[in-house]
UniProtKB/Swiss-Prot annotation:
Keyword Protease among record annotations: no
Coiled-coil segments: none
Name of the protein this chain belongs to: Glycine--tRNA ligase beta subunit
Keywords: Aminoacyl-tRNA synthetase, ATP-binding, Cytoplasm, Ligase, Nucleotide-binding, Protein biosynthesis
Protein biosynthesis is among the record's keywords: yes
InterPro entries reported for this sequence: DALR_anticod-bd, Gly-tRNA-synth_bsu, Gly-tRNA-synth_heterodimer
Quaternary data: Tetramer of two alpha and two beta subunits.
Gene: glyS
The organism's place on the tree of life at top rank: Bacteria
PANTHER family, sorted: GLYCINE--TRNA LIGASE, CHLOROPLASTIC_MITOCHONDRIAL 2, GLYCYL-TRNA SYNTHETASE
Region (Disordered): 65-84
Catalytic function, reaction form: tRNA(Gly) + glycine + ATP = glycyl-tRNA(Gly) + AMP + diphosphate
One Pfam family this sequence matches: DALR_1
Signal peptide segment: none
């Protein structure tokens, strides 16, 4: 027999972000705990609104299946002595409710142990759910939980009611919260405004429909879809197109139970404000959706003097709600207009002295000092990249002004507009387009998935800003630990790598870090002998993560290009970021087309055996390290001659970074190496004669070293 189960937790208005998180958590937690309780079920439906969390489980058996379990007891030598049961055996059998003759001895990896096969009768589902429900509530996680009344129960907002039904029967659940006891029933509440009365849920399976009649759309996806469609329709009514941010849409979805679209209007005089100011006021501060005139790209769109909001109130009072919304946004936009006019009253450069009042970090001084460091680092990068004199001037100017907007009134009020306003104020002050654009772009990327700077000036200053933060904070010994990363150092390092790769900048990061660290120590009298090693390891770890997660390179191929605690590969990786990326992608491609498989066996085998030798890994040429007089077979001579032919191809690949040429050469040598190992004229590498052994290991070492120009084949796993 199967039943439908309903649990609803009724609350005061929950934070929107918690509603979404709770859905995700329950979608994982509830099926997992049911499976652990032998009540596996594929029909777990989680619902949530600002005032309730609910789950409906269909086709739930009324009891667990009966089952057998093998239960491990004490070691056999402790349970039996001279063939007779000891107190340990008696205690185990008593605890399990079985007879002594039911005990069995089985051999495990850790020795012989006593076991018992126990038949366990399935419990009623109602009893199991009674145990699980408090755990489902207790295990929910969020940022801010609270206590209420005089109890110890914690939840983001006070719990006001519980519904728990198995089909049409109430499942008794009690949540104790000091003197307050919350007891399950079949009564829920409808919409606060549209249906504030109690509603009775007669059957668990009817939950969604009963709530809908009380003006509650409990299904997050349905609610979100309705809101999105209402916004689009409303925008079309005013001959516009709404910009629907996925983040804002998700938030608004969890702020309402029965969404109603409301169209508002603002004075056209505010359209002279930069569009980013108006949309920031709407989206970030008021949770309104802006409306645009065209369907072009966002940057080209022209704002209309309208906005769209989603109300949780009475649809018949939409006009009154719109008036209230219009009053609020008028005040906010008037503030923005005042800030904008005030900020434009003086040129952007005149704000630089005020940066002395903004602290970057207590020991590192003000943002003005950070700007000086950014200018210095930007010059180093421009020098490395051999940038033209004209572009270098733009870079230096933009670096000087890149943080000036932080002390403007607009950015003080709307911090998310940093860089955006700097670009506009720079343009208004007569700075070149390259300088203005670079001021905005140096903040890019602002997070995972964000756009990257497109201009060389923006790229250089963005790199300089991030490298300054990394070296300075690491220089103070403030390394990120676990989830604690207050200066967003991981994001900064990711930005350095992604910008370099996106723009194909041939950066020598190893040299840059040395130069920046030297200047840092001179300026701040800090001593940290491990700084470069710590920074190198940190950046290499970020490179590894990006290759794995964003470039989808196999883990063993990532290890092959970065090495495993290999000093040569570490330094090489930071000296040429583009080469690391290109080698990883190339390896992935030749794995997929089968070419890697054709050279893998011989090179991997050679690499593993060569580890027993002492040949320097940078040695490529056989002339100085191979004694042909020690050859005992034709296969050795053939191997030697093949290596002589291989070296020029390796050197060309090393110089041009054309690794296909090296792989072609390795393909050519592979049969010769196979014959050396397993052919009719094969040899024993580990010869009793130490000189012959060394000579043969050197042959293998040379092949390994030539292949190392591409990757460490010892790290590659057979596909």
């Amino acid at each position: 027999m199967i039943v439908t189960f309903l649990l609803e937790i009724g609350t005061e208005e929950l934070p929107a972000n918690f509603v979404y998180e709770a859905i995700q958590q329950w979608q994982e937690l509830i099926p997992m705990t049911l499976k652990e309780a032998f009540l596996t079920n594929d029909s777990v439906n989680v619902y949530a609104t600002p005032r309730r969390l609910a789950v409906v489980i269909d086709a739930l058996p009324t009891k667990q299946p009966d089952r057998e379990e093998e239960i491990k007891g004490p070691p056999a030598k402790a349970a039996f002595k001279d063939g007779k049961p000891t107190k340990a055996a008696e205690g185990f059998s008593k605890k399990q409710g079985v007879q002594l003759n039911d005990l069995q001895i089985c051999t495990t990896e850790k020795g012989d142990f006593v076991f018992v096969n126990k038949k366990i009768q399935g419990k009623p589902t109602a009893a199991i759910l009674t145990e699980l429900i408090p755990k489902w509530i207790d295990k929910l996680e969020g940022k801010r939980f609270m206590r209420w009344a005089d109890g110890e129960l914690k939840f983001p907002r006070p719990i006001r009611w519980l519904v728990a039904l198995l089909d049409d029967e109430i499942l008794p659940i009690n949540l104790d919260n000091g003197s307050q006891k919350i007891t399950s029933d079949r009564f829920s509440y409808g919409h606060r405004v549209l249906h504030p009365k109690l509603i009775e849920i007669s059957q668990a399976k009817n939950y969604v429909e009963v709530l809908k009649k009380a003006y509650i759309e409990v299904d997050y996806k349905q609610r979100k879809s309705k809101i999105e469609q209402q916004i689009k329709t409303a925008a079309e009514e005013i001959k516009g197109k709404a910009e629907i941010s996925e983040e804002l849409l998700a938030e608004v979805t969890n702020l309402v139970e029965w969404p109603t679209v409301v169209i508002g209007k603002f004075d056209e005089e505010f359209l002279i404000l930069p569009g980013e100011v108006t949309t920031t006021v709407m989206e970030t501060h008021q949770r309104y959706f802006p409306v645009f005139k065209s369907t072009k790209t966002f940057k080209d769109m022209e704002l209309l003097p309208y906005f769209i909001t989603i109300s949780n109130g009475d649809p018949e009072k939409s006009e009154i709600i719109a008036i209230g919304n219009e009053r609020v946004i008028k005040a906010r936009l008037a503030d923005g207009q005042f800030f904008y006019k005030t900020d434009l009253a003086k040129p952007l450069e005149s704000y630089l002295p005020e940066l002395e009042t903004v602290t970057f970090q207590a020991k590192l001084g003000s943002m003005r000092e950070k700007v000086k460091r950014i200018v210095s680092i930007a010059k180093l990068i421009a020098g490395q990249l051999q940038i033209t004199q004209e572009e270098s001037k733009n870079i230096e100017r933009a670096a000087l002004l890149c943080k000036a907007d932080l002390v403007t009134q607009m950015v003080y009020e709307f911090p998310e507009l940093q860089g955006v306003m700097g670009e506009k104020y720079a343009r208004a002050a007569g700075e070149t387009e390259a300088v203005a654009t670079a001021i905005f772009e140096h903040y890019l990327p602002r997070g995972a998935g964000d756009i990257l700077p497109k201009t060389i000036s923006g790229q250089v200053i963005s790199l300089a800003d991030r490298l300054d933060t990394l070296v300075s904070i690491f220089g103070l010994g403030m390394l990120p630990t676990g989830s604690a990363d207050p200066f967003a150092l991981r994001r900064a390092a990711n930005g350095v790598v992604n910008i370099s790769w996106s723009a194909n900048l041939p950066l020598n990061l190893h040299q840059l870090l040395e130069e920046i660290a030297t200047n840092f120590f001179k300026t701040y009298s800090q001593t940290n002998s491990d700084l470069l090693a710590q920074l190198s390891n940190f950046l290499l770890q970020r490179i590894k993560t990006i290759l794995l997660e964003e470039k989808n390179i196999d883990y063993d191929l990532v290890n092959a290009v970065l090495g495993d605690n290999d000093a040569e590969y570490k330094e090489r990786g930071l000296k040429d970021l583009l080469d690391v990326r290109n080698r990883a992608i190339f390896l992935q491609n030749i794995r997929q087309n089968g070419m890697l498989g054709k050279i893998y066996e011989t090179i991997n085998r050679s690499t593993r055996l060569a580890a027993q030798g002492e040949l320097d890994k940078i040695q490529l040429k056989p002339l100085k390290v191979i004694d042909s007089k020690l050859f005992k077979s034709e296969s050795e001579l053939a191997f030697y001659n093949a290596l002589v032919e291989l070296v020029p191809q390796t050197e060309i690949s090393q110089k041009t970074r054309n690794y296909q040429q090296l792989v072609d050469a390795l393909l050519k040598i592979a049969p010769t190496v196979s014959n050396f190992f397993d052919g009719p004229d094969s040899v024993l590498v580990i010869d009793p004669d130490p000189k012959i052994k060394k000579n043969r290991l050197n042959l293998l070492g040379l092949l390994r070293n030539n292949a190392r120009v591409l990757a460490d084949f010892g790290q590659i796993v057979k596909n």
